[in-house]
Swiss-Prot record:
Its main location: cytoplasm. One of its GO terms (biological process) is regulation of neurotransmitter receptor localization to postsynaptic specialization membrane. Homotrimer. Homooligomer. N-terminal region is dimeric while C-terminal region is trimeric; maybe providing a mode of oligomerization. Upon IL1B treatment, forms a complex with PELI1, IRAK1, IRAK4 and MYD88; this complex recruits MAP3K7/TAK1, TAB1 and TAB2 to mediate NF-kappa-B activation. Direct binding of SMAD6 to PELI1 prevents the complex formation and hence negatively regulates IL1R-TLR signaling and eventually NF-kappa-B-mediated gene expression. Binds to TNFRSF5/CD40 and TNFRSF11A/RANK. It is an enzyme of class 2 (transferase). Pathway: Protein modification; protein ubiquitination. InterPro entries: MATH/TRAF_dom, TNF_rcpt-assoc_TRAF_met, TRAF-like, TRAF1-6_MATH_dom, TRAF6_MATH, TRAF6_RING-HC, TRAF6_Z2, Znf_RING. This is TNF receptor-associated factor 6. There is a cross-link at residues 124, 319 (Glycyl lysine isopeptide (Lys-Gly) (interchain with G-Cter in ubiquitin)). CDD domains: MATH_TRAF6, mRING-HC-C3HC3D_TRAF6. Belongs to the TNF receptor-associated factor family. A subfamily. Residues 350-499 form the MATH domain. It is found in: Cytoplasm; Cytoplasm, Cell cortex; Nucleus; Lipid droplet. Residues 1-354 are annotated as: Interaction with TAX1BP1.
Length: 522
């Protein structure tokens, strides 16, 4: 407010200058501690800043007062600064002057250093509040200087470069120019429908393969790509050499006159032909005969080799088909053995199965990308005899309601070898655990225990290889909790399932199983 009062109280340019000097002295004292920061900031100005347009080169309405003009560039002050001697300059102008002309004020030659300059925010506000005219030709808008840049960004009279010919046009006219006037606008060829630039269309028309052209000899109208064949084969008036030109006839005539020429010059043509044959007969032929004989022998050898190779290819094809059939049988046998081994391994679990889920980082990435992740474990038995079960792990998507970013874990019954001898529905206790793989003495596994509910479809005897109904936890564990400890090691997650079955002994006896005696002597 002191600066505002100082400006308003000065009635002349001299008093204004005196006021500014006083203000500069007070500001210099008040900002003494900040002069180092100001010096560093001023000293680090880039060369690109120094080369920018200094003052505001715009038309003011009313005209700009002289007190807002930079004495160096004679334009409106941009980023106005004051000197201790009370003069105002554009920041870029005065810094350039100090660096080029020496440390002195351009107006009164007083000693002036860069760190003595200070921003004139009052003048800056005043100048930005002045009314200016839009510099674009044809635009009548007036606005405060502070709004000029925003106006020019949307002004319909601003110049923009045509994206096709790169010439500048006013924004409101650019669309019409692009569609109707631009020499590089795309137009379609009337003959081949190809898109070409308007200024290149004349050249294209002169070379278009589908353009209609007139034969220069017979005036027939054809498309350009047909013309060479027309000249060589069909044109009746095209000049062609005599058929006997190879034998010495140098006459040329129109194609429709060739028959008459051959008829009228039969004797001379025969003499030329006889002379050519006679000259050939004088050439020794022993070399040619031997060469032809060599070619014949080579051809005979190649034909024999071709026949042998054809037989070999047929034999190899038959062997390959036999081997392919054998390999297919071996693959089926391997799959059968693998299934049997997996079944035997599943029977050895005795109700405790540890499921190793590899490449778990890939599954987490799919979950983050909102791709469904559902994984089933191999089957395992609760004992021998026992029920066959498997686990299902589901990574809930971030957008799922009430269970977003949770691990869901379920148990499914499967068709097993002993199903006909076991009591149904399944009864027992299931303990699901995600194992802590840290090296700590006491590991903090994440565990849940559930009891089977015989009335649910999930525990009835399955009628297909895997019961579609499962039993477990939709919100077994949050993914954030999974990352807090070492549940994932070597990109592998370990899930443990421990099953304790409760058999109805009467049912077991009816199914043909007898309970093992506790007597150690048996």
């Amino acid at each position: 407010m002191s600066l505002l009062n100082c400006e308003n109280s000065c009635g002349s340019s001299q008093s204004e200058s005196d006021c500014c000097v006083a203000m500069a002295s007070s500001c210099s004292a008040a900002t003494k501690d900040d002069s180092v920061g100001g010096t560093a900031s001023t000293g680090n100005l880039s060369s690109s800043f120094m080369e920018e347009i200094q003052g505001y080169d715009v038309e003011f309405d009313p005209p700009l007062e002289s007190k807002y003009e930079c004495p160096i560039c004679l334009m409106a002050l941009r980023e106005a600064v004051q000197t201790p001697c009370g003069h105002r300059f554009c920041k870029a102008c005065i810094i350039k002057s100090i660096r080029d002309a020496g440390h002195k004020c351009p107006v009164d030659n007083e000693i002036l250093l860069e760190n003595q300059l200070f921003p004139d925010n009052f003048a800056k506000r005043e100048i930005l509040s002045l009314m200016v005219k839009c510099p674009n030709e044809g635009c009548l808008h007036k606005m405060e200087l502070r709004h000029l840049e925003d106006h020019q960004a949307h002004c319909e009279f601003a110049l923009v470069d045509c994206p096709q010919c790169q010439r500048p046009f006013q924004k409101f006219h650019i669309n019409i120019h692009i569609l109707k006037d631009c020499p590089r606008r795309q137009v379609s060829c009337d003959n081949c429908a190809a898109l070409v630039a308007f200024e290149d269309k004349e050249i294209h028309d002169q070379n278009c393969p589908l353009a209609n052209v007139i034969c220069e000899y017979c005036n027939t109208i054809l498309i350009r790509e047909q013309m060479p064949n027309h000249y060589d084969l069909d044109c009746p008036t095209a000049p062609i050499p005599c058929t006997f030109s190879t034998f010495g006839c140098h006459e040329k005539m129109q194609r429709n006159h060739l028959a008459r020429h051959l008829q009228e010059n039969t004797q001379s043509h025969m003499r030329m032909l006889a002379q050519a044959v006679h000259s050939l007969s004088l050439i020794p032929d022993s070399g040619y005969v031997s060469e032809v004989r060599n070619f014949q022998e080579t051809i005979h050898q190649l034909e024999g080799r071709l026949v042998r190779q054809d037989h070999q290819i047929r034999e190899l094809t038959a062997k390959m088909e036999t081997q392919s059939t054998y390999v297919s049988e071996l693959k089926r046998t391997i799959r059968t053995l693998e299934d049997k081994v997996a079944e035997i391994e599943a029977q050895q679990c005795n109700g405790i199965y540890i499921w190793k889920i590899g490449n778990f980082g890939m599954h987490l990435k799919c979950q983050e990308e909102e791709k469904p992740v559902v994984i089933h474990s191999p089957g395992f038995y609760t004992g021998k005899p026992g029920y066959k079960l498997c686990m299902r792990l589901h990574l809930q998507l971030p957008t799922a309601q009430r269970c977003a970013n949770y691990i869901s874990l379920f148990v499914h019954t499967m068709q097993g070898e002993y199903d006909s001898h076991l009591p149904w529905p399944f009864q027992g206790t299931i303990r699901l655990t995600i194992l802590d793989q840290s090296e700590a003495p006491v590991r903090q596994n994440h565990e849940e225990i559930m009891d089977a509910k015989p009335d649910l479809l999930a525990f009835q005897r399955p009628t297909i290889p895997r019961n579609p109904k499962g039993f477990g936890y939709v919100t077994f564990m949050h993914l954030e909790a999974l990352r807090q400890r070492t549940f994932i090691k070597d990109d592998t997650l370990l899930v443990r399932c421990e099953v304790s079955t409760r058999f109805d002994m009467g049912s077991l006896r009816r199914e043909g199983f007898q309970p093992r005696s506790t007597d150690s002597g048996v």
